[in-house]
Amino acid sequence: MTDLNIPHTHAHLVDAFQALGIRAGQALMLHASVKAVGAVMGGPNVILQALMDALTPDGTLMMYAGWQDIPDFIDSLPDALKAVYLEQHPPFDPATARAVRENSVLAEFLRTWPCVHRSANPEASMVAVGRQAALLTANHALDYGYGVESPLAKLVAIEGYVLMLGAPLDTITLLHHAEYLAKMRHKNVVRYPCPILRDGRKVWVTVEDYDTGDPHDDYSFEQIARDYVAQGGGTRGKVGDADAYLFAAQDLTRFAVQWLESRFGDSASYG
């Protein structure tokens, strides 16, 4: 039978998700590499459907979407070109704005899934489907989109999980929430203009956040994740052809905050 090169099936994926520890009713944030999973009978959307079936209708699936076309660079443009952007660039519309391509095609698939909910922070936007999707995505502040009351904070509060499905460990978005919480020296604050819809009209607002695009020179998310795994955190398995990790969001966040503060906190020694 192995000579037939049968693609991974829906049933096989459901079994693999359950073997990893995914259970009915969980709230789960997914990071995924479709390429790493391998060929799937029916296409990549079957991965999402299999995961939702493992979670059951009582569960919730969330992914980072962001905004593919966010014009956060316009302050660096020549004045004449910036003026064109200010006049012509469309606003962020949660119903239509595309998910960031680099973060997996599955994020765009989930964005267009029936009954999807999407949070209103353009750069830190999350999409979610399931019982707690509305709770996770509601009232997402424009400033400090990975902080208090963000979808990530809510995922931690409801004791949700993070699934890394063939995705690199340096892409765990939840660790931005840990960075927000950690009392560290020299957090870099950035401000950028962003067009949003307000009462049906485009308005430009200034968004303030910690700089998530310029990671600290002295650490990486992958290093935090591997240290967490080394001390027994999470579970590891195989889904399709992909290496997969399942992390409890609350425990991973607690570990990451302690990890960051012990090295870069106010009381940490300078090395």
UniProtKB/Swiss-Prot annotation:
Domain of life: Bacteria
Catalytic activity, EC: 2.3.1.81
Binding site for CoA: 31-35, 104-105, 109, 171, 173
Residues binding a 2-deoxystreptamine antibiotic: 64, 72, 102, 123, 146, 170, 176, 212-213, 221
Result when mutating residue 170 to F: No effect in catalytic activity with gentamicin as substrate
Keyword Acyltransferase: yes
GO molecular function, one term: identical protein binding
Position of the signal peptide: none
Keywords carried by this UniProt record: Acyltransferase, Antibiotic resistance, Transferase
GO biological process: 2-deoxystreptamine metabolic process; acetyl-CoA catabolic process; antibiotic metabolic process; cellular response to antibiotic
NCBIfam families to which the protein is assigned, alphabetical: AAC_3
Protein family according to the UniProt entry: Belongs to the antibiotic N-acetyltransferase family.
Subunit relationships: Homodimer.
Name of protein: Aminoglycoside N(3)-acetyltransferase III
